[in-house]
Every structure is written in structure tokens, then in C-alpha cells.
Amino acid sequence: MLLLAASTDAHSLLLESSPAAGATLSEGPPQISLRFNNRIEKKLSSIRVLDERGASRPATVLVSDGAADRLTATVSALAAGAWRVEWQVLSTDGHIVSGNFSFRVAPSATR
């Protein structure tokens, strides 16, 4: 029974993201960063960034950077509009966990 509880606790849960879910930014972020409740297998994890039409933008996961509970990807310049981040990580318990969130980049102020 105790082993089963320990195994269940090992599933990775997203604790924090940058940008935050639902955020409106003045400019596109250079990186997407995710923090989980435990270690993840970065080499077998991914981040996708999709525009309003569902087209994927290049995102490069930085496998060697940061703490073992963080997944970070660099992204090319993101234009004004709504963006969806889809992530998938391999937990140290061997289970694949995925999720998504959205944020917006506000249009530039015109003079």
C-alpha cells in the first residue's frame, strides 16, 4: 500500500509557468519555462507553441539547462495574438503527463 501511494505521488504536476496561464504580455517571450513538483526526464519531454490557427512555432527544449524539475524552451519571436503552449513530460515514475495553457501577446501601441 505504501509503495502504491509513493508511485502515485511521483506523477509530475505543473506548478508554475512563465509566461503564466492567461497572462497578457507586451511582447513575445524569448522562452517558455515550466516548473513541476518533481524531477522530469528532460530528454524525453517536449514543449510546443501554437498560434491562433493551430500552426506550430519552433521551440527548442534546453535539455541541459536549469533544475531537474524545470523544462525550458527557446522560441522564435511571437507576434501579437493568442498563443497556446502544449507540454508533455516523462515523470521519473515512467508515466507521461501532458497539459496546455494559453497566453496573449498584446498588439504594439501605435503613436
Enumerate the predicted regions with their spans.
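Short, surface-exposed alpha-helix to beta-strand junction/turn motifs within ectodomains of secreted
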Residues: 33, 38-57
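Short, flexible loop/turn segments at beta-strand junctions in immunoglobulin-like
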Residues: 75-77
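Contiguous beta-strand segments within globular domains
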Residues: 25-33
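A glycine-anchored, Pro-Gly-centered beta-turn/N-cap motif
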Residues: 28, 79-85
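N-terminal signal peptide c-region/cleavage motif recognized by signal peptidases
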Residues: 5-7
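Aromatic sugar-binding surface patches on proteins
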Residues: 67-72
